Amino acid sequence: MTDERIHVLRDILLELHNGVSPESVQERFDATFTGVSAIEISLMEHELMNSDSGVTFEDVMELCDVHANLFKNAVKGVEVEDTEHPGHPVRVFKDENLALRAALIRVRRLLDTYESMEDEEMLAEMRKGLVRQMGLVGQFDRHYQRKEELFFPIMERYGHDSPPKVMWGVDDQIRELFQTAMETVKSLPEIPISTVKEAFEAVATEFESMIFKEESILLMILLESFTQDDWIQIAEESDAYGYAIIRPSEKWIPERKSFVEEKSAEEPVQLDTAEGQVQKIIDTPEGQFTITFTPKEKEAVLDRHSQQAFGNGYLSVEQANLILNHLPMEITFVNKDDIFQYYNDNTPADEMIFKRTPSQVGRNVELCHPPKYLDKVKTIMKGLRDGVKDKYEMWFKSESRGKFVHITYAAVHDESGEFQGVLEYVQDIQPYREIDTDYYRGIE
């Protein structure tokens, strides 16, 4: 990262700040930054934002389109073309940020107006409006959950495990700041409006900074790393977490291209020989070579409907799966290597107490939880592995869901007593708490 590049970037940003069109600086930007990664440019932008250069958050956000054009051709064709589709996860993510920023602006205007208002009747109505608008801002949690539960697991698979850890921690800080701000809004008029504005600006500042990090750093990493299949998986699993303020206006159905090409004349000639061996004739600059080998046998496909010895009886894999999915509880299994290996499917994802999606399977259990809960997760796993306890139990009442949630973490051992993992089962016990009789055997 050279000083010269930073100076050029600063000049371009200031020109944008003064009203020049992005198109007028595109050529100079391309000439200076071709070959520089999106990540490096984003770091330079971040450095300028935090200096006394005069560059603002809005300036950098405007430049995002400029360097997005630069990287458009470097990212695999169809994925980049589709990111502007209304249902593509990238477009949805950015549209949510626009809607959330608009909600922040509305709250800020309401607070300013409230501060100068004297009509008590109008003030009462404005307090209701503030709570409504803050409620809209509060939908950012759905946006963050999709990022944390759908984007981060795939990033980790590609080796980008540091940004998720840092960003998730900041997300939680923003959640806490928002809760504080919301409580102050609801405390009006008992507390000064200046206290409310201070709490709101604290969360708004961090919130806008996170939008920058998401669009100028996070999305650039994703566009350079993720495949079309990754984006399809994210799109399919997004409904489970919901959306912030807006929803996709239509479903994204990508154009799928076939990667299977017809055999050409240049391909090696393959000949079958006796005893299951195969010969291939390969053309090289030195002439033709013939190689002989035995192809690997295809593994037999498991018949999910064949009966297998199963505990005290017999079941097919299909029957075992159906039974697990019909148990009145959410089950998760983490194996002895701390890998999230399985969860049952007994309820739609958007109704689950603890949401699980296929993209989480295969993650280290420590990466499946917010940083603030990491110490507790480690303590539970170690306690069960070391035999300190056979199980840990927790419970809490969820007023918003009308549920009383009971959670059990139980050690799983094989017949020889060897630790094999941890079984988590979660259930709503509120219906049992409401039983008011000692006897019932009816079938109504």
Where are these regions (language model features)?
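Small-residue-biased structural context
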Residues: M1-D141, Q145-Y392, F396, K403-V405, ...
